[in-house]
């Protein structure tokens, strides 16, 4: 399947957009943890804040993705809704998936049929997203995938939460930074990238 993963164009709320142009590490981690035959492209829209519509239109046209995933923080919700409306017009057959802090904490914000999602990945996404792609590819039910919410007609079904992954077991693979289709990440004008060294609270 062809997968397009997008992070929102909004910068951190109290910093100038030009100061923070950092990549979304979660999306490259998703890309690194799907089955190898899927073709995944990651686009951090913070790099194209003045050309969001043009960039998304170009990517949708060139890639014709089957799945489009959006990573959303709460202050980015309006941008996500606008992007979903655009994507519905550009890719009426694509499955639109949202994940990240905001959909995990407020899934009801994404249940509108016009600007809402088809599927919500709640909590840690790597395993849930991989299982989602497998189910969609095989035409299987989504009902047995922990950590998933999915549209059933006009209503959403919320599956049970997925347990937090235990990284010491090696159950997650490394991120795929080569899936990025945009570049030139900077922090205060200097080149930057991100690396995840831990998850969750330091104790407990």
What are these regions (language model features)?
Residues 22, 176-204:
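Radical SAM [4Fe-4S] cluster-binding motif and immediate context
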Residues 171-174:
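Glycine/tryptophan-enriched, flexible segments
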Residues 1-4:
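Extreme N-terminal starter segment of soluble prokaryotic enzymes
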Residues 11-13, 157, 166, 202-204:
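Short, acidic Gly/Pro/Ser/Thr-rich loop/turn segments
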Residues 6-9, 13, 43, 71, ...:
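Short hydrophobic segments within beta-strands
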Residues 26-34:
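Short, charged N-terminal beta->alpha structural module
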Residues 20, 33-167:
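Glycine-rich beta-alpha loop elements in corrinoid/cobalamin-binding modules
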Residues 13-27:
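Glycine- and acidic-residue-enriched helix-capping/strand-helix junction motifs
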């Amino acid at each position: 399947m062809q997968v397009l993963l997008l992070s929102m164009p909004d910068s951190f709320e109290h910093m100038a957009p030009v100061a923070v142009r950092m990549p979304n590490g979660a999306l490259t981690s998703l890309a690194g943890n799907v089955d190898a035959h899927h073709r995944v492209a990651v686009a951090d829209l913070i790099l194209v804040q003045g050309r969001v519509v043009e960039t998304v239109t170009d990517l949708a046209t060139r890639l014709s993705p089957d799945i489009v995933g959006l990573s959303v923080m709460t202050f980015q919700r309006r941008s996500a809704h606008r992007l979903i409306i655009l994507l519905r017009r550009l890719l009426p057959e694509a499955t639109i998936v949202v994940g990240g802090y905001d959909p995990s904490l407020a899934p009801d914000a994404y249940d509108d049929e016009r600007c809402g999602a088809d599927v919500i990945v709640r909590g840690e996404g790597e395993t849930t997203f991989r299982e989602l792609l497998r189910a969609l590819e095989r035409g299987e039910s989504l009902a047995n995938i922990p950590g998933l919410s999915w549209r059933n007609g006009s209503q959403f079904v919320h599956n049970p939460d997925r347990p937090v992954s235990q990284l010491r077991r090696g159950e997650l693979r490394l991120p795929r930074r080569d899936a990025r289709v945009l570049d030139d990440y900077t922090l205060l004008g200097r080149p930057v990238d991100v690396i995840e060294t831990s998850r969750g609270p330091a104790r407990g």
